[in-house]
Amino acid sequence: MPKMKTHRGSAKRFKKTASGKLKRGHAYTSHLFANKTKKQKRHLRKATLVSPGDFKRIRQMLDNLK
């Protein structure tokens, strides 16, 4: 059976933390900033963790990620 391959699109979007959780960036950060409040833009800058509901599915795509 062939080797499992890491999903390259997901590998660019997620980083694994030291404890094994997955870190991701926020959506809504590419353009149209004039319509967003300062508070909203400030919160969107910070990375956040992947939710438990999505974690299992994303982990399968990133099985070989270091």
Curated annotation (Swiss-Prot):
Keyword match Metal-binding: no
GO annotation terms (biological process): translation
Pfam families listed in its UniProt record: Ribosomal_L35p (PF01632)
Comp. bias regions, Basic residues: 1-26
GO molecular function annotations of the record: structural constituent of ribosome
Region (Disordered): 1-29
UniProt entry tagged with the keyword Transferase: no
Taxonomy, superkingdom: Bacteria
GO CC, alphabetical: cytosolic large ribosomal subunit
Keywords carried by this UniProt record: Ribonucleoprotein, Ribosomal protein
Family, as annotated: Belongs to the bacterial ribosomal protein bL35 family.
NCBIfam families membership: rpmI_bact
Protein name, per record: Large ribosomal subunit protein bL35
The species this protein was found in: Geobacillus stearothermophilus
Upper classification of the organism: Bacteria, Bacillati, Bacillota, Bacilli, Bacillales
